[in-house]
């Protein structure tokens, strides 16, 4: 049956939630800004030094279950922001903490939580429209380098590297990050492509921490057939199991018994396998599958040619040096051997492009040419120690995400300045709101927007209030640079954030805070006394 639950209402529930929110946001908040500190996580006895908000948030569990519910909400803010923008997680946590703190004060003094939430949402919506008007497009690799350096925690080297990688593969190219066997960090362009499909089942995941599938030197099966029964795939599975290498399947779909068989064999460790659905639709799907076949050197098993999956042999499989499958995309890095074929294919597509009249076709052809010829910029991350490697990989990951976000939606001044400037637009939005409590929601956002800049200043040992006042009086691009302790044009001095990151952090903070404020009750497991467990002797299996 269900375990005993503990229920708390109103004031008590919100106070406990808030305590959890504060604890977690404060632990994450110390890393904000160029003068932010690192946090040491002691996981399974090997300490890691981390400067990445979402990684810290994920590592914290609070002992009190009510407080942990609050912490879980901040974790949610960090994760959501990480998923949508890939960076800005710390900022989002700090914003959420402020909105929740101010919101709870208002609710305690009698404001209606639902109206507050409405006011918060209306204000944020208005500010995001303002942000879109203010964001300016990325110009050249100087901007890219600046965005990447800041996201990597003010690391110029990483910034230069990302800018270099994007120069090589273009803004539509693919960046892949792996660990290097040496101490050097390098950028190489390799043949490969990105496919807009993710794994069919999360059971295929090999890296649980990042929920991705990672294969090295995999064999590749490509078909436009639906695989449903066991008998279709058993012959192939038996052959590939003997090769002892991972198998990657691209098919119209895999369902029923066939999928169950793959998952069971994967979980039992008999064969490392993963599958994605074929990208695109109709005629174009065929074309894209042929492209993937060429990149991997596989034979495309087309059902109209009678090439059935159940008759497939190992010789018809392609190979890929590295495959990374995310929830919605897959990156494929080819064996060096398929280079000539890829180039021939690109030449053929360019010829088709010059001959077509259809705008739609030419767009799609151009996209395929870009995917095939752009290749994949592989950043091989080197470091002297495991701890340093992990920290550097997280920083490069952040920098990569921030850079693509900047290319997508433009850039704004960093250092929390964009939020402070946005706060000056709140009164105008508030004018359009009638309801008294909704207007309080607008006030809450106006105050909360100052928190990130204030914390960046405090982390640098400077009085936050003073900084905020100064930024407010200045132009949009001006702000406080905590690195140099000067007020200056942040865009010119390269302190810039992607508008997308600024937007997502605010939206996610507001959305989760709205949930907290409209919470009347929390139900959590009653903490049970932990039974004492006898430790197994060294070297013995614990059963």
Curated annotation (Swiss-Prot):
The GO biological-process annotations, alphabetized, read as: protein folding; protein refolding
Q: Where is the transit peptide?
A: 1-2
Q: Which UniProt keywords apply?
A: ATP-binding, Chaperone, Chloroplast, Nucleotide-binding, Plastid, Transit peptide
Q: Does the keyword Chaperone apply?
A: yes
Q: Which Pfam family is one of this chain's hits?
A: Cpn60_TCP1
- Give the matching SUPFAM superfamilies: GroEL apical domain-like, GroEL equatorial domain-like, GroEL-intermediate domain like
Q: Which GO terms describe its cellular component?
A: chloroplast
Subcellular location per UniProt equals:
Plastid, Chloroplast
Q: Name one GO molecular function term.
A: ATP binding
This protein's source sits in the domain of life called Eukaryota
Grouped into one coarse class, the protein's main location is plastid
The further comment given in this record reads:
This protein shows ATPase activity.
Family assignment from sequence similarity: Belongs to the chaperonin (HSP60) family.
Database matches in NCBIfam families: GroEL, PRK00013.1, PRK12849.1, PRK12850.1, PRK12851.1
Q: How does it assemble?
A: Oligomer of probably six alpha and six beta subunits.
Q: Which HAMAP family match?
A: CH60
What's this protein's function?
A: This protein binds RuBisCO small and large subunits and is implicated in the assembly of the enzyme oligomer.
According to UniProt, the name of this protein is RuBisCO large subunit-binding protein subunit alpha, chloroplastic
What species is this protein from? Triticum aestivum
Lineage from the top down?
Eukaryota, Viridiplantae, Streptophyta, Embryophyta, Tracheophyta
């Amino acid at each position: 049956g269900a375990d005993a639950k503990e229920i708390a209402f109103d004031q008590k529930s919100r106070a406990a939630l808030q305590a959890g929110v504060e604890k977690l946001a404060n632990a994450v908040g110390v890393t904000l800004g160029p003068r932010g500190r690192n946090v040491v996580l002691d996981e399974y006895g090997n300490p890691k030094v981390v400067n990445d908000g979402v990684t810290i948030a994920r590592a914290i569990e609070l002992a009190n279950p009510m407080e942990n519910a609050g912490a879980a909400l901040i974790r949610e803010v960090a994760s959501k922001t990480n998923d949508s923008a890939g960076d800005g997680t710390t900022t989002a946590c700090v914003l959420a903490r402020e909105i929740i703190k101010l919101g709870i004060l208002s609710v305690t003094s009698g404001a209606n939580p639902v109206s507050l939430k409405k006011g918060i949402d209306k204000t944020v919506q208005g500010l995001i429209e303002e942000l879109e008007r203010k964001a300016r497009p990325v110009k050249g690799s100087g901007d890219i380098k600046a965005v990447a350096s800041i996201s990597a925690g003010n690391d110029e080297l990483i910034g230069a590297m990302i800018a270099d990688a994007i120069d090589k593969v273009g803004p539509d190219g693919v960046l892949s990050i792996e660990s290097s066997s040496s101490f050097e960090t390098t950028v190489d362009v390799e043949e490969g492509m990105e496919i807009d499909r993710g794994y069919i089942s999360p059971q295929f995941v090999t890296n649980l921490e990042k929920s991705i599938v990672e294969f090295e030197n995999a064999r590749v099966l490509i078909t436009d057939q639906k695989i449903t029964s066991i008998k279709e795939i058993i012959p192939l599975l038996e052959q590939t199991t003997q090769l002892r290498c991972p198998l990657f399947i691209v098919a119209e779909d895999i369902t029923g018994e066939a999928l169950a068989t793959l998952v069971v064999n994967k979980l039992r460790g008999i064969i490392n396998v993963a599958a994605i659905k074929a990208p695109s639709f109709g005629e174009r799907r065929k074309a894209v599958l042929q492209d993937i076949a060429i990149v991997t050197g596989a034979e495309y098993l087309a059902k109209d040619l009678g090439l059935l999956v159940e008759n497939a042999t190992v010789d018809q499989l392609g190979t890929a040096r590295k495959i990374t499958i995310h929830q919605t995309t897959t990156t494929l890095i080819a064996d060096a051997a398929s280079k000539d074929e890829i180039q021939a294919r690109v030449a053929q597509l360019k010829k088709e492009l010059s001959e077509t009249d259809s705008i739609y076709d030419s767009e799609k052809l151009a996209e395929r040419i870009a995917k095939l010829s752009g290749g994949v910029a592989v950043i091989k991350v080197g470091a002297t120690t495991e701890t340093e490697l992990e920290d550097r990989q997280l920083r490069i990951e952040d920098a990569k995400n921030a850079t693509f976000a900047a290319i997508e939606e433009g850039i704004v001044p960093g250092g929390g300045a964009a939020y402070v400037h946005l706060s000056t637009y709140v009164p105008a939005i508030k004018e359009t709101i009638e309801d008294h409590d909704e207007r309080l929601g607008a006030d809450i956002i106006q105050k909360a927007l100052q928190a990130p800049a204030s914390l960046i200043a405090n982390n640098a040992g400077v009085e936050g209030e003073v900084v905020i006042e100064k930024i407010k009086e200045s132009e949009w691009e001006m702000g406080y640079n905590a690195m140099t302790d000067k007020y200056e044009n942040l865009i010119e001095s390269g302190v810039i954030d992607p508008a997308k990151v600024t937007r997502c952090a605010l939206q996610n903070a507001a959305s989760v805070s709205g949930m907290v404020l409209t919470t009347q009750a929390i139900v959590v497991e009653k903490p049970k006394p932990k039974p004492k467990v006898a430790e197994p002797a060294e070297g013995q299996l614990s059963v």
